[in-house]
Every structure is written in structure tokens, then in C-alpha cells.
């Protein structure tokens, strides 16, 4: 009788241990799901993507986002949230300038959620590029080489709005010199502490652009 009781007690103790482990695991999973929505997580995620982008080539980032589309979606989702706290969004000023002219051919390089296109008159012909997008009108490409999509001297305005990431970002500028028409314009909007302005301006002037 004692043996049966000891055996039953052992079984009940084992079941309780399994149940406690299951509850603890569920609690851990619940805590994790909450944590990924915290401000700290989002800031860390954005910083990690920026660090990766600033130390990698555009071809590497293109492959990364194509293989990890959820990372692209999460990045731009958080970025759209952050924009609500900005005192000014440069995309609005660029749109204002683009709307001064109709019937342009415009290339938006690193278009993100493709918002700029919605702010500009519908008379213009539009090419939107990014590493990845769920928008079927966006061309998934490495913007350092767009020969497959843009002919020489075919674009009136090229836009780089918060998109000069990558160790080879000057290649984007050089490539724009190829497809821009004579007299075409490049619009660049970047944080002052992100890009070496002297290097950017010197490089642009060196390949034939004027300020």
C-alpha cells in the first residue's frame, strides 16, 4: 500500500512540475511578445538595421531584405511611427519642389513606403525603387546599378530621401549622373550627422554635378 502511495505521490509531483514548467514557458513567451513592442526594442531594432546598412554594401543589403522581407516591413513600420515625432518631414519639401513642374520623369531611390509618389502630381512618369516592397509598382533593385530599368539621359529628377545608406553610397550618385537628362536635378535629404557633407559634395562636383 505504501509503495502505491509513494508511486502516486511521485506521479502527481511529476505532473505538477510539468504543469509549472508549461506555465512558466507561456509566461516567458507572453513577456517576450510584450517586450518586442516597447520603445526600447524598437529603438534597438532601428539602430541595428542602420548599423548593418552603414557597414554593408548596397548589394548585400538588397540580398538581406529580399531574404528577410519581414525585417523590411518592421523597419518601415517603426520608421513611420517615429516620423510622427519629427518637427519636419523632408519628403514634404521635396514634393513641393517636384510639383512646380509637370510631365517630369522622376526616380525615387529608396522609396520606402512609396509615400512621395502620392504627394506629387499625376502628370509625371514615376519610377520607385527599393530593396523590397509589397507595393507592386515599386521596382526591387540595387540602386547602385539601374541600367536594366533606366536608360541613359532619361530622368528629369532623382530623389534620395533618407536613402544614402551603404559603404558604396557614392555609387548611387554616380549612377544617377548616367540616367539623368542634361539639366536634371538630384534632390538629397539626409541627417547632417549621417553623411560626411564635404565628401558628398566633393564627390558630386567631381562627377559633374553643380550645386
Predicted regions and their residues:
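Terminal intrinsically disordered, low-complexity, charge-rich regions
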Residues: 1-30
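Class I SAM-dependent methyltransferase Rossmann-like catalytic core
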Residues: 17, 25-101
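Class I SAM-dependent methyltransferase SAM/SAH-binding core
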Residues: 88-92, 96-148
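A short acidic, Gly/Pro-enriched loop at the edge of an enzyme's catalytic core
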Residues: 144-158
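Short catalytic micro-motifs in class I SAM-dependent methyltransferases
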Residues: 161-163
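A short glycine-rich, Lys/Arg-flanked "PGG" loop and its adjoining helix->strand segment in the class I
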Residues: 170-185
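Short alpha-helix
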Residues: 193-211
